[in-house]
Regions:
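Substrate-binding cleft of secreted/luminal carbohydrate-active enzymes
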Residues: 294-320, 338-415
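Pro/Thr/Ser/Gly-rich low-complexity, intrinsically disordered linker/stalk tracts
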Residues: 393-449, 503-514
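Solvent-exposed loop/turn segments flanking beta-strands in beta-repeat/beta-sandwich domains
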Residues: 441-469
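Active-site-adjacent "subsite" loops/lids of carbohydrate-active enzymes
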Residues: 51-53, 57-66, 70, 141, ...
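Aromatic- and acidic-residue-enriched segments that line the glycan-binding/catalytic groove
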Residues: 97-112, 147-173, 210-232, 276-287
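Catalytic domains of carbohydrate-active enzymes, especially glycoside hydrolases
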Residues: 70-96
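Aromatic-lined carbohydrate-recognition surfaces of secreted/lumenal glycan-active proteins
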Residues: 138-148, 206-209, 240-289, 339-347
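Beta-strand-rich modules
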Residues: 485-505
């Protein structure tokens, strides 16, 4: 969702020091700008994501395949340099596909015309997954579940399912949407998710804040017919929430049946309910998930139907209708069974002066708030293009201070015992340079949750405590079995550990440079 929409709906409601340059061998070089004092407060584990959306981004349509690939590499490189460890990439904006699909047409946002394949043919999602994983980053496939069109100007072919079976859809405020009341629609959306989960090495399936449509003044949702057929005597608002609940539960079960380690994440609007509506609600006066979008995020948390939530707290710290300072604490206190990260708006954060110090922006306070709250495990930056474009120095601030160390993602819940340790660490020296290499534990033929998929390399200075809990000691997070060492001087020590698909870490194996 755009920042402008967030601001509008809130108002209406008053309503160590090492950088990685990734090729197939990771090169370790010194980062002179990182001081130990800046890195001290950076946790070893933290989710640091960024959304890269395709909808509304016409730059994709004007690029050749080679240029589009270069663009993806550039964007992911810049996110990694800013300290991010997860890419949330939009692959289904409007019942279409930014990947090869037999279920839905190619996205017009990619090629300029819905159904038109890129030429020469390539698969943007597969390419982005490979590039993220090369850099040790997670890839979350981001889908919008219900939206079919985003504007009234879009014309769908006569063969489109919304024209063939119009009763399964409704039009609202210039958009066409799947009617959440239909089991056929839930089945179809889950089939799309099953297909992605089965065919692609995604780390998560991610859906955003669009459930029932955001309310337009004076316009009622045109679902009278489906309510009469399927309401079963329920209150209409409860019935709408129930329809969304059914999809969330079915999506979670679909993903876990296909690949138990793939996570299901949701980034809802930043207000569940206001306190004046419900005593359990937040000190806010904006639009409400529960009442306006029919999305009961607290129920999903209670039922265990979601692995993580990222409430979109895109407002300034003390915004009147939706103060993010209070809302972040509310979410911390009310999400109990699900991992919680905070959606932060880069532009609003960098534009807004800190209320207690007008000589700086709100970035420091927002990061500090999230890190000081027990149940918050990280942040996700909206949008990633503002990070990669270094809006008002945002990327510099992240790279030099707030995300200056390499962070491992949090440990996730799931089956398995965790990964085995690596074996036989060696330091090789040749005309090409010095390399640290190791033998990885063998994975079986069948994919498992505790497969070894990434490796963490630690470097310790002479006399330094060999503590793998020290975030400053991490110098590489990589899927490869070999890294180049710039200056393996005598007295240095190295450790290598394994991460599995749930980011559980093996015991370290050490090497001492003599």
């Amino acid at each position: 969702m755009s920042l402008g929409q967030h601001e509008s709906w809130a108002a209406q409601g008053s309503h160590k020091h090492i950088e990685m340059k990734h090729t197939f061998i990771i090169i370790l070089t010194l980062l002179a700008f990182v001081t130990s004092s800046q890195a001290l407060d950076n946790p070893k584990r933290e989710f640091r994501g960024a959304w890269l959306h395709v909808i509304g981004q016409t730059q994709w349509q004007n690029k050749t395949t080679a240029q589009a690939k270069e663009y993806i590499v550039d964007q992911i490189d810049k996110l990694q340099r800013a300290g991010c460890n997860a890419v949330i990439f939009q692959v289904r904006p409007t019942a279409d596909a930014v990947y090869k699909s037999d279920l839905e047409p190619w996205s017009a946002w990619l090629t300029g015309k819905r159904g038109k394949a890129p030429n020469p043919l390539w698969d943007p999602m597969e390419f982005a997954i490979q590039e993220a994983h090369k850099r040790g980053m997670e890839f979350h496939a981001w889908l919008n579940p219900y939206r079919v069109t985003s504007t009234a100007k879009e014309i769908l072919p006569k063969s489109h399912i919304s024209n063939m079976e119009p009763q399964r859809f409704f039009r609202y405020n210039g958009q066409i949407l799947f009617d959440p009341a239909y089991q056929e629609n839930r089945d179809f959306i889950c089939e799309v998710v099953k297909d992605i989960t089965h065919r692609y090495d995604v780390d998560a399936i991610h859906i955003d804040d669009y459930f029932y449509p955001y309310p337009a003044p004076g316009k009622a949702i045109p679902d009278d017919a489906s309510y009469l057929r399927k309401g079963n005597g329920m209150n209409r608002n409860d019935w709408r929430r129930h329809n969304v609940d059914l999809l969330i539960e079915q999506l979670y079960n679909t993903i876990k049946k296909e690949k138990p380690w793939v996570r299901f994440g949701i980034s809802p609007f930043g207000i569940w309910r206001n306190k004046r509506t419900d005593p359990r609600g937040s000190e806010s006066t904006g639009l409400q998930n529960y009442d306006d979008l029919y999305a009961d995020v607290l129920l999903w948390d209670q039922k265990g139907w979601v692995d993580y939530v990222v409430p979109q707290l895109y407002w300034s710290l003390d915004q009147a209708a939706a103060p993010s300072r209070k809302l972040v604490k509310w979410w911390n206190d009310n999400i109990h069974n699900t991992d919680l990260y905070i959606g932060q708006d880069v532009k609003r954060t960098m534009d807004s002066p800190d209320p207690k110090n007008h000589d700086r922006n709100e970035l420091d306070t927002k990061v500090t708030l999230s890190r000081n709250l027990k149940n918050v495990g990280g942040n996700v930056w909206w949008h990633g293009y503002w990070v990669t474009g270094n809006y008002k120095g945002a990327a510099d601030s992240l790279a030099k201070k707030y995300q200056s160390t390499i962070a491992l993602p949090p440990v996730y819940k799931g089956p398995g015992k965790g990964p085995k340790a690596v074996k036989k660490i060696e330091l090789e020296k040749s005309d090409e340079g010095s390399f640290l290499s190791w033998d990885a534990p063998a994975n079986g033929r069948e994919e498992k949750t505790d497969d070894a998929i990434r490796f963490v390399v630690y470097e310790f200075l002479p006399g330094e405590k060999l503590d793998i809990n020290n975030s400053q000691a991490i110098v590489a997070l990589t899927p490869f079995h070999r890294v180049r060492i710039a200056n393996p001087e005598p007295g240095l020590s190295y450790a290598v550990t394994t991460l599995d698909r749930l980011n559980r870490e093996s015991d370290p194996i050490f090497l001492y440079v003599k």
